[in-house]
Amino acid sequence: MTGPDGEGTGAIWAAAGPAIKTSNSETRSGKRAFISIDSCHYIAVMLKVMIAPVTPFQQNCSIVWDSETMEGTAVDPGGDFDRLKQAIDEQGIKITKVLLTHGHVDHASAAGTMAEHYGVKIEGPHKDDLFLIEGLPESGRKYNFPAYKPFVPDRWLENGDTVSLGNLSFDVVHCPGHTPGHVVFVHKPAQIAFVGDVLFRGSIGRTDFPFGNHEQLLSSIRERLWPFGDGMQFVPGHGQTSTFGWERKTNPYVADLLFDD
């Protein structure tokens, strides 16, 4: 089965990179499980991440929180709201905002419902994705998604903005190409980025959508993401985690050896 972003659906993945583990026994029963990024890897900043592949498209919703204040967010809650809520509440996380990388249905559908439930605002993506946000009800019907609450983000994000979460601060990087308003959230102290569908392990985002632009996507990755350094680990919108350095060496679309500069 192929999702709206062109990524194949499948079973829970054992994520690559340090200190990542499955957090419960659901994998053994064949159900979708959560993936945890253990805070011991980021002991100086106390950032915690739990990755939940949601909907039949297995879109990686990242639940991110400051373990000192327990203030948290969901990055790209594309669906399965009840399941996300249960995990959030079990961890004792206080959701203070919802973050969106872009406006595609598998990333944004449940954002309005989550924001209403927790009484918080939605931040992101960039305003150039407004047409996708406005089209979510129609897109949801096309892919048989539940009828989640329509919304318009409370804060559109620009390149160079920052997003706060408890004592944590994330850089906002506008990375158009997959969609015109796509943004990436980067936490430099923890060396982790939430990249949505800009970059995958061994691949890049599709650009055969309205206003997609392949050359623009390549430029976004090489000019706006690579400068954060090879050690930056990233959580993609689908599939396994990786690092910028690994993709610069091996990715068949953006490896350094493909470019003359």
Enumerate the predicted regions with their spans.
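Active-site HxH/HxHxD metal-binding segment of metal-dependent hydrolases
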Residues: G79-S164, L168, K249-L257
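Short, Lys/Arg-enriched N-terminal segments with co-localized hydrophobic residues
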Residues: A33-V45
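Conserved beta-strand hairpin/beta-sheet module of binuclear metal-dependent hydrolase folds
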Residues: M46-Q91, V184-G196
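Residue-level detector of structural "landmarks"
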Residues: A11-G17, R32-I35
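Short, glycine/acidic-enriched loop or turn micro-motifs at the edges of active sites
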Residues: E68-T69, G79, V105, D129, ...
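N-terminal helix-forming leader/targeting segments
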Residues: M1-G8
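Metallo-beta-lactamase
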Residues: E138-S139, T162, L168-D261
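Active-site neighborhood of phospho(di)ester-bond hydrolases with catalytic His/Asp-centered motifs
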Residues: A74-V75, T96-G103, E123-H126, H174-G177, ...
